[in-house]
From Swiss-Prot:
Keyword Transmembrane listed: yes
Pfam families: PSII (PF00421)
Similarity field: Belongs to the PsbB/PsbC family. PsbB subfamily.
Organism in which the protein naturally occurs: Oenothera parviflora (Small-flowered evening primrose)
Protein role: One of the components of the core complex of photosystem II (PSII). It binds chlorophyll and helps catalyze the primary light-induced photochemical processes of PSII. PSII is a light-driven water:plastoquinone oxidoreductase, using light energy to abstract electrons from H(2)O, generating O(2) and a proton gradient subsequently used for ATP formation.
Name of the protein in question: Photosystem II CP47 reaction center protein
Main location: plastid
GO CC terms in record: chloroplast thylakoid membrane; photosystem II
Subunit structure: PSII is composed of 1 copy each of membrane proteins PsbA, PsbB, PsbC, PsbD, PsbE, PsbF, PsbH, PsbI, PsbJ, PsbK, PsbL, PsbM, PsbT, PsbX, PsbY, PsbZ, Psb30/Ycf12, at least 3 peripheral proteins of the oxygen-evolving complex and a large number of cofactors. It forms dimeric complexes.
HAMAP family to which the protein is assigned, alphabetical: PSII_PsbB_CP47 (MF_01495)
Keywords: Chlorophyll, Chloroplast, Chromophore, Membrane, Photosynthesis, Photosystem II, Plastid, Thylakoid, Transmembrane, Transmembrane helix
Length: 508
């Protein structure tokens, strides 16, 4: 047939049996990739430290998606929350991976069967005997079934009525666990950070899908609409399906990048806006302030800050700090976090507390500037020492640590003070192991960043695909010069004007 690579899909254009076969094979590939990727991630994942080396620091991509749907245990005897388990059951991480691979194999066999047995009676119109699909009826069937699945997920899986529930956490990603969720039917259900909205929206959308599916199964489209939207053409199905997919891809790119109840920070890492707004820093200071109000010392108040909360307040966990083309996990960038050194408090020789100005997200380097409580610059690490007025040496800056491994330790020698001032630009200070993975010290993005970039890119690509195929199906007669209602068999190339026997070509 000699088709160029970008035209090969025409072979299934008028062949419903093999069109079904290639779609089943596509499902086999998707499910097979998911299962294989899960097994690979399980082979390299280290579950030993869920606080300082969580899945998102290790670059896990499919494990977070399994976890948010209620999978927490492994046949290896470990739990994602750090404990050990004796009876993980069939729906463990390995169980889900295995079921996807098994499903992939069955789809592979089904695809081969449908490719071989393509000429089934169900695909032919009994009136004409030609291959034919009742596309509006198929649309109704698919809408009904997807509505049923959507309703079932919201009403049973998410609510825990028949299923585990979903991953739910507090606003600071500290207490996450899988638990049943009650539907939120009030206005709070529209808050993207309220898990109850996931249940209620799936129930509502599923109900709508079931009713719409039944409608399309029982009501035929008007003839004008059928012809106007080219409902008899399979390319119309392709175009509208691409539209649904790119719309969904844009939505999930948004919920992932900006954060929502569906993308918990314990599973996918923090968002860049939490660094930009000092989200975790404010909560840490609030907790310290509450401790001081209870007559705790600074050391006691800072020692009560969870290491997990302090770790979120570190720029290396900001997904926007990794370049788009820096491959690898966060751990292979700045290293594996080993421990929190504590919170450094800087003071000048007059006893004023100084605060290091933090590095904004899109800077690679940033001047080290220390300001007092009123925002007045009191010290810095100058670029040109000859003209310096606020250098650490001149101002007499010292640093003392509260909480963490260096609790109670203070330094006054300028070199050490400057070292910790530079590190304080990046948020809370952590000891990082760069030797184990040969980490190069260059920040990487988290799975949150990769997911967003991938889905936004493919959404844009699919948007153009929708326009392309929509235009092809709506203007097929214009592009091809063929009347879409032409029923007679015509021989391409026999006439100068297609289908007009008065313009028969002369044999050369």
């Amino acid at each position: 047939m000699g088709l160029p690579w970008y035209r090969v899909h025409t072979v299934v254009l008028n062949d419903p049996g093999r069109l079904l076969a290639v779609h089943i094979m596509h499902t086999a590939l998707v499910a097979g990739w998911a299962g294989s990727m899960a097994l690979y991630e399980l082979a390299v994942f280290d579950p030993s430290d869920p606080v300082l080396d969580p899945m998102w620091r290790q670059g896990m991509f499919v494990i977070p998606f399994m976890t948010r749907l209620g999978i927490t245990n492994s046949w290896g005897g470990w739990s994602i929350t750090g404990g050990t388990v004796t009876n993980p059951g069939i729906w463990s991480y390995e169980g889900v991976a295995g079921s996807h691979i098994l499903f992939s194999g069955l789809c592979f066999l089904a695809a081969i069967w449908h490719w071989v047995y393509w000429d089934l009676a169900i695909f032919s119109d009994e009136r004409t005997g030609k291959p034919s699909l009742d596309l509006p009826k198929i649309f109704g069937i698919h809408l009904f079934l997807s509505g049923l699945a959507c309703f079932g997920f919201g009403a049973f899986h998410v609510t825990g009525l028949y299923g585990p529930g979903i991953w739910v956490s507090d606003p600071y990603g500290l207490t996450g666990e899988v638990q049943p969720v009650n539907p939120a039917w009030g206005v709070e259900g529209f808050d993207p950070f309220v898990p109850g909205g996931i249940a209620s929206h799936h129930i509502a959308a599923g109900t709508l899908g079931i009713l719409a599916g039944l409608f399309h199964l029982s009501v035929r489209p008007p003839q004008r609409l059928y012809k106007g939207l080219r409902m008899g053409n399979i390319e119309t199905v392709l175009s509208s399906s691409i539209a649904a997919v790119f719309f969904a891809a844009f939505v999930v790119a948004g919920t992932m990048w900006y954060g929502s109840a569906t993308t918990p920070i314990e599973l996918f890492g923090p968002t860049r806006y939490q660094w930009d707004q000092g989200y975790f820093q404010q909560e840490i200071y609030r907790r310290v302030g509450a401790g001081l109000a209870k007559n705790q010392s600074l050391s006691e108040a800072w020692s009560k800050i969870p290491e997990k909360l302090a770790f979120y307040d570190y720029i290396g966990n900001n997904p926007a700090k990794g370049g788009l083309f820096r491959a690898g996990s966060m751990d292979s960038g700045d290293g594996i976090a080993v421990g929190w050194l504590g919170h450094p408090i800087f003071r000048d020789k007059e006893g004023r507390e100084l605060f290091v100005r933090r590095m904004p997200t899109f800077f690679e380097t940033f001047p080290v500037v220390l300001v007092d409580g009123d925002g007045i610059v009191r010290a810095d690490v100058p670029f040109r020492r000859a003209e310096s007025k606020y250098s650490v040496e001149q101002v007499g800056v010292t640093v003392e640590f509260y909480g963490g491994e260096l609790n109670g330790v203070s330094y006054s020698d300028p070199a050490t003070v400057k070292k910790y001032a530079r590190r304080a630009q990046l948020g809370e200070i952590f000891e990082l192991d760069r030797a184990t993975l040969k980490s190069d010290g260059v920040f990487r993005s988290s799975p949150r960043g990769w997911f967003t970039f991938g889905h936004a890119s493919f959404a844009l690509l699919f948007f153009f695909g929708h326009i392309w195929h929509g235009a092809r199906t709506l203007f097929r007669d214009v592009f091809a010069g063929i009347d879409p209602d032409l029923d007679t068999q015509v021989e391409f190339g026999a006439f100068q004007k297609l289908g007009d026997p008065t313009t028969r070509r002369q044999a050369v």
